[in-house]
Amino acid sequence: MKINQPAVAGTLESGDVMIRIAPLDTQDIDLQINSSVEKQFGDAIRTTILDVLARYNVRGVQLNVDDKGALDCILHARLEALLARASGIPALPWEDCQ
């Protein structure tokens, strides 16, 4: 999936996460995480984000994650909404998701 434009998903409310994405000129993934629960769950947050990006074959992006204690399912949903917005498609290609 190609990221064409910057996008934002989520809020800064307690129990939620705000994620910003922007395309990069390289194939790197620049991931910055700021979380109120980073000491306990930072590795799990990073793993979830990288798993979702790999599932949709996303490369060459900068991600800024401001987590306020979001559950894994919320993080997953926010990421999928963000990818749809940033790629300019109305819905994710569920049938292509492996």
UniProtKB/Swiss-Prot annotation:
Pfam families: ACP. InterPro entries: CitD (IPR006495), Mal_deCO2ase/Cit_lyase_ACP (IPR023439). The modification O-(phosphoribosyl dephospho-coenzyme A)serine is found at residue 14. GO terms for cellular component: cytoplasm. Signal peptide: none annotated. Keywords: Cytoplasm, Phosphoprotein. Coiled coil: none annotated. It is found in: Cytoplasm. Belongs to the CitD family. Covalent carrier of the coenzyme of citrate lyase. Oligomer with a subunit composition of (alpha,beta,gamma)6. This is Citrate lyase acyl carrier protein. The gene is citD.
